[in-house]
Amino acid sequence: MAEVTFPQLIQRACGIDVHLKVVVATIDGVGIHRETRSFKTFTSSLNELKEWLLSNGVTHVAMESTGVYWKPVYKVLEDSIPNVWIVNARHIKNVPGHKTDKMDSEWICKLLLAGLLKPSYIPPKEQRQLRDLTRYRNKLIQQIASEKNRMMRILEDCNIKLSSVVSDTSGATATSLIDMLCEGKVLTLDDIKSVYHGKLSASPEELLEACTGFVEEHHIYLLQMIRKDISQTQQLVSELSERIKILLSKYENVLELLKEIPGFSTKVVEDLVSEIGLDMSHFPSEKHLSSWAGLSPGNNESAGKKKCPNHSRKQTGKGGNYRSRMDCDPYKEYVFQ
């Protein structure tokens, strides 16, 4: 059976099948014979891969976005090879059958030579570093919220009904009362009045009744541990925020303009810039940006019926999950403008 061929649009290319311990690379093109080699994923082996590609005059490299395994390969090649593409694995699926690493790399190389692959948007190194910081900060903020919820469950176990009379258990009054309970103190009406805020809907007497329960030594120990964990995590968040501020200091004028958008706080602006950057030339139109950010419905039609759009991780990828979780209305309005 004759081999299926495609018109060749790229002179010399390489397709790489990336794994945890090994990468399989196939080169092909004008003036070179198709060749497949395997390299370990240690830095020295990846440098050998780079030298092999340079010696053969390869100008385009494509690989699947496999977990985080592609990142070291990309970092080694991005400064030496003119075009290093990360492509969506769903866009380069081969026909089912005899699947091997060599066949996968050959298939990627064949598609790349024919100009049938579309590169994913990989931000510049500076933006990738900023994104690592903002995503880690958001993860820590989620941990703080989780620990606060754990604290409230322990208080409920003690029959402390603070959440029933206070709308915001993270407010100044509620925090002060929880701190007293963590110290093992039996609250009195004078204690309540000493931290009472006039804007609270509940009266001091109602707060006292809600804070009367059966707090045991076991509960106090757990509450103290959780409070200590929250304090340490908040310190890490502050340090990350300072680091992010330093990295964005040279874009202060642009950040101030973005903060003029109603509802855009400093953190929202920092998260926005880390995810989509400041260079909009990467996106042909606002529709491309909305789609990439996971904020626009996709086309999912079968038998003439349009199915409900679903922005799952399968459609948007891990990065899309981060972007779609920035679900504040101002962010969405900004992207759609």
Go through each PLM region and give its residues.
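A detector of single, family-specific signature residues
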Residues: 1-337
